[in-house]
Amino acid sequence: MPLSDTQKTQIRDGFAHLRESLQPASLAFYEAFFRRRPDLRPMFRDDLAGQGMRFMATLGLVVDALDTPEELAERLAELGRGHAALGVKAEHFAPMGEALIDTLQAQLGAEFTPEAEAAWRAAYAEVARQLVASGQLA
């Protein structure tokens, strides 16, 4: 991911703060997502707590691999293929990204500066790009 060292630090610091309240943050994330796309709710299991924690675990993998994107690429390729099998489309990633930004704003408060937001947006855009490409999502 073409992120500066400052951006990587902002992402790591933000995720460290988010780790303090992962369960509520993960639920807030899916609430924000389904506010944007209620039509997609049937694609998800009833266990949103578990789904949310899986999302946060994946987010943690991304954060941990900021300096080694080649290691992350294999995992993202696998995830992209899995998402394709579930019927996920490329268009689903934009509202998910906005839900992530909403969640970070709510959880991090003043820590979530415009610069931190730009860093998170850049990282998410690259992850989404890789997922879409590897899953050949339409």
Language-model-derived ranges and their functions:
Residues 1-138:
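Globin-like tetrapyrrole-binding proteins
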